[in-house]
A protein has these predicted regions:
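Cysteine protease-like catalytic core of ubiquitin/ubiquitin-like
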Residues: 71-182
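Generic detector of well-ordered alpha-helical segments enriched in charged/polar residues
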Residues: 11-21, 65-69, 136, 189-193, ...
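Intrinsic-disorder/low-complexity loop/linker signature
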Residues: 25, 56, 103, 121-122, ...
Length: 257
């Protein structure tokens, strides 16, 4: 095709949501922000916060605060939340959803309470500590309530129950986001319970069909997406970007790339 669609391609979250918002007329419900996180020699991602497990650091684009202020008249704001290890070639995806009506900021973990290999929940505790102690205040949401993955899903989450092949965490996170957008007043736990009532094979089938649906939508809009991706990887990448780090001591540093 004209675009490189991959189920774990992070920029396709924003590309797909722009299509969804336009087609379903959700412009008053969802805010599509426009900021980037750039760090290292060649890493850039749109509308995201990242957690570096190796360094115990939370990476926040400086432009995030300004973009959130533009979204105060919308119900939902999404933030892709990436979990990275320096010694691994790939990471893991969560989804952050800000609900401006209920004054909440939730983090959805498709594995369940925490990463399936985070047996002692050390990663969960570190991330939640950074959210509660620093992040909410820094991004101007100190009066919001943080909803941890343990408050949304049982220990065994949707992705783990389905046992889908590695890399589908982006798609599971995006599916949860779409279900929240389309069912704004349904409790988060009920959305997860609805999916977990299904058998392993049913969940597996749902996520693969959903991934195919996203792929088809992206290919239908390939011309626009080529322009968006070119903007991200050429013009935007050349600009110097600042990002804020909440370090392992939960102190704030500012980094420039």
């Amino acid at each position: 095709g004209d675009i490189s669609y991959e189920y774990n391609k992070i920029e396709n979250i924003t590309n797909y949501l722009k299509i969804l918002v336009d087609e379903l007329h959700f412009n008053k419900v969802v805010c599509i922000t426009n900021y980037t996180l750039k760090y290292g020699a060649n890493y850039i991602v749109k509308n995201a916060i990242e957690y570096n497990v190796t360094r115990d650091e939370l990476l926040i684009p400086e432009d995030l605060v300004k973009e959130l202020k533009k979204c105060r008249n919308k119900r939902f704001i999404y933030i892709y939340f990436g979990i990275l290890w320096e010694q691994r070639p790939s990471g893991h995806a969560n989804m952050i959803i800000i609900d401006t009506v209920n004054k909440t900021i939730e983090r959805y973990e498709p594995h369940g309470h925490s990463l399936i290999y985070d047996k002692k929940k050390n990663i969960l505790k570190r991330i939640d500590s950074k959210f509660n102690s620093k992040l909410l205040n820094y991004i101007g949401l100190k009066n919001y309530t943080y909803i941890s993955p343990v408050d949304i899903s049982p220990k065994i989450g949707v992705q783990v129950k389905a046992d889908a092949y590695n890399g589908m965490c982006v798609t599971y996170s995006l599916m949860y986001l779409q279900l929240r957008i389309m069912n704004p007043d349904v409790d988060q736990k009920d959305i997860v319970k609805y999916l977990l009532k299904k058998s392993r094979s049913e969940i597996y089938d749902i996520i693969l069909r959903y991934a195919k649906y996203i792929e088809d939508k992206l290919k239908e809009n390939s011309t626009k997406i080529i322009v968006h991706n070119d903007q991200l990887y050429t013009k935007t990448f050349q600009k110097i970007k600042k990002f804020v780090v909440i370090n392992k001591r939960n102190e704030i540093d500012i980094i420039i790339y």
